[in-house]
Design a protein with these regions (language model features):
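Classical Sec-dependent N-terminal signal peptides that target proteins to the secretory pathway
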Residues: 1-29
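Low-complexity, repetitive regions of proteins mediating host interaction that are extracellular
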Residues: 3-4, 25-182
Length: 182
């Protein structure tokens, strides 16, 4: 009887762990795009195209866009470092009939647990528009998965009451896992 109860307890705890972990992964997937990656030797392209946001009458508008990437990875001790490559950022805006834009690019950046990798902005006649991109990651030991969270925050400010404008930004990058060679 004790052996039977012990087996039931083990099964119940295992099931609880799976459901708990699933809810963690599901919380990352909500309101975001999700990419599942099986081959760790692939370079993972990441594109975030954001919708334009508008501001007028002296107001400021802020909008956040997110994309999550989950990478299954069985042995984190083999990981040498995490790198973003081919980073490109673009921000443009339209104000009073004219278009303005700014592009930035970086070859690569090493990812720490919370990395700010692009801070792209453009201003004209007191109107400030910016796009700020960050990436953070977490490791889920139960599912043996890295969860990368890319966040892009757009801010558009129309300082003049007669101004109406929109700002739009996007960025592309590639996620690369560099492994120890054995």
């Amino acid at each position: 009887m004790k052996k039977y109860l012990s087996m039931l307890t083990t099964i119940a705890l295992s099931a609880a762990s799976i459901f708990s972990t699933s809810s963690i992964l599901n919380s990352y997937a909500k309101n975001s795009n999700l990419i599942n990656v099986d081959n760790l030797h692939d370079v993972i392209p990441i594109d975030i195209v954001e919708y334009p946001i508008f501001a007028d009458n002296g107001e400021t508008t802020v909008k956040t866009f997110e994309k999550n990437v989950i990478v299954l990875f069985s042995d984190p001790s083999k990981l040498k470092y995490i790198e973003l490559t081919d980073i490109k950022s673009h921000v443009d805006f339209h104000i009073n009939g004219k278009d303005y834009y700014n592009d930035q690019s970086k070859n690569s950046v090493i990812v720490s647990s919370d990395t700010k990798f692009i801070d792209n902005s453009i201003s004209h006649e007191g109107n400030m528009n910016k796009v700020q991109q960050t990436v953070s990651y977490d490791y889920d030991w139960n599912q043996k998965a890295f969860i990368f969270k890319f966040v892009s925050v757009e801010t558009v400010t129309a300082n003049n009451e007669k101004d109406t404008q929109f700002v739009r930004g996007y960025f592309t990058t590639s996620l690369k896992l560099n492994l120890h060679e054995f």
